[in-house]
UniProtKB/Swiss-Prot annotation:
It comes from Rhodopseudomonas palustris (strain BisA53). NCBIfam families: lgt. Catalyzes the transfer of the diacylglyceryl group from phosphatidylglycerol to the sulfhydryl group of the N-terminal cysteine of a prolipoprotein, the first step in the formation of mature lipoproteins. Pfam families: LGT. It is a multi-pass membrane protein. This is Phosphatidylglycerol--prolipoprotein diacylglyceryl transferase. A 1,2-diacyl-sn-glycero-3-phospho-(1'-sn-glycerol) binds at R147. Belongs to the Lgt family.
Length: 281
């Protein structure tokens, strides 16, 4: 017997102010950046987490937000163009700048963030590993909101599920088959679980080992994404790749390896002392 749920009807527009229309996906980006900004400021101001003053000044973090926002948007769009739909955008290059139609890649956005961290850190002569730690500490917030927006938009739905699965759902654009609400799985794994793990690590003193949160985020996100991809329908223009893998899996495997290496190296280094971590607030 089928118990598939009907997908709830959501308006893709969160709200409108005159001619200005704000969609849920845009609101997720805005919310993730703003909430993440405040959360990172709280981490910077908590001297106990650093064993002294944080190596990143508050004013520097405030300036960095613009850099990382550009990295997320430009990197996310570039990654989607290159990794997921290159042939289409070669034929329709003008659509590359039409961001309101959707099409962003986490892996591209992450690379954009890496470039922003490196460029800003070197420009301001700040510890790049610590800047990366702060950026990755807030990352799950945006991931959680972004996956909820994917669900609201009825996009990136899951693979067909057993009709007896209590939470199997029929999506408006997914045909008649009940499917896994994989967006919610990913919101839980990439957002809630990853945030809790990193928060517990920070509470235990991980910020005193520059690069530990950075490496842990990279590796754990890769694991979470690979698990999520097991339930997510592959992008139709790509389908399954070698050995039944998806593009998301292929892009995430290197993250697991790189993350483990970065975290291991950070763990082997001696933790910051009060004098070594002294910075500005």
């Amino acid at each position: 017997m089928s118990f598939a749920l009907a997908f709830p009807v959501f308006d893709p527009v969160a709200f409108a102010i005159g001619p200005i229309v704000i969609r849920w996906y845009a609101l997720a980006y805005i919310g993730g950046i703003v909430i993440g900004w405040f959360y990172a400021r709280a981490l910077i101001k908590n001297r106990r987490l650093w064993g002294g003053a944080a190596p990143i000044p508050l004013i520097a973090w405030d300036d960095f937000i613009l850099w990382v926002t550009l990295g997320i948007i430009l990197g996310g769009r570039t990654g989607y163009v290159l990794f997921y739909n290159l042939d289409f955008f070669i034929a329709h290059p003008i659509e590359i700048i039409e961001l309101w139609k959707g099409g962003m890649s986490f892996h591209g956005g992450f690379l954009g963030c890496v470039i922003a961290v490196l460029a800003f850190g070197w420009n301001r002569k700040l510890p790049v590993a610590t800047l990366g730690d702060l950026t990755c500490a807030v990352g799950p917030i945006g991931l959680f909101l972004g996956r909820l927006a994917n669900f609201i938009n009825s996009e990136l739905w899951g693979r067909p599920a057993d009709p007896s699965l209590p939470w199997a759902m029929v999506f408006p654009t997914g045909g008649p088959l009940p499917r896994h609400p994989s967006q919610l799985y990913e919101a839980a794994l990439e957002g809630v679980v990853l945030f809790v793990i990193l928060a517990l690590m920070i509470r235990a003193g991980a910020l005193r080992r520059p690069g530990l949160i950075l490496g842990s985020f990279i590796g754990l996100y890769g694991v979470a994404r690979i698990i999520g991809e097991l339930f997510r329908e592959p992008d139709p223009q790509l389908g399954f790749l070698w050995g039944g893998l998806t593009m998301g899996m292929l892009l995430s495997v290197p993250m697991v390896i790189v993350g483990a290496i970065v975290a291991a190296r950070a763990w082997r280094r001696a933790p910051l002392t009060a004098s070594a971590s002294a910075g500005h607030t």
